[in-house]
Amino acid sequence: MVDAFLGTWKLVDSKNFDDYMKSLGVGFATRQVASMTKPTTIIEKNGDILTLKTHSTFKNTEISFKLGVEFDETTADDRKVKSIVTLDGGKLVHLQKWDGQETTLVRELIDGKLILTLTHGTAVCTRTYEKEA
């Protein structure tokens, strides 16, 4: 099932990203720059290791992990978090925990698009990606 997520995905729509970043405590200047970028996400698999790369004019990040195994992650906004990614009902669910807080990043495929739903407290952001040929 995870194979359906593999490939290169380009951001085409974003709703409430600034509110989500504000909820995380991201500063104004960083939010302004991050809101303007249109990142590309590349999801690859090598054996049982998944790699998720995000490339943008703002910042490039890369994480590699096994489904269901906790790992240390430094986020694009420099938070040091404990992360775990699971496959749940056809969705890739990425949970980040730090300093008594948590946020979820849920990726699902709807009508050939990758929908990323980011949740922190009451802040919910939806980002839509289309697969590149």
UniProtKB/Swiss-Prot annotation:
The modification Phosphotyrosine is found at Y20. This is Fatty acid-binding protein, heart. Belongs to the calycin superfamily. Fatty-acid binding protein (FABP) family. It comes from Homo sapiens (Human). One of its GO terms (molecular function) is long-chain fatty acid binding. FABPs are thought to play a role in the intracellular transport of long-chain fatty acids and their acyl-CoA esters. Hexadecanoate binds at R127, T128, Y129. (9Z)-octadecenoate binds at R127, T128, Y129. Octadecanoate binds at R127, T128, Y129. It comes from the Eukaryota. PROSITE patterns: FABP.
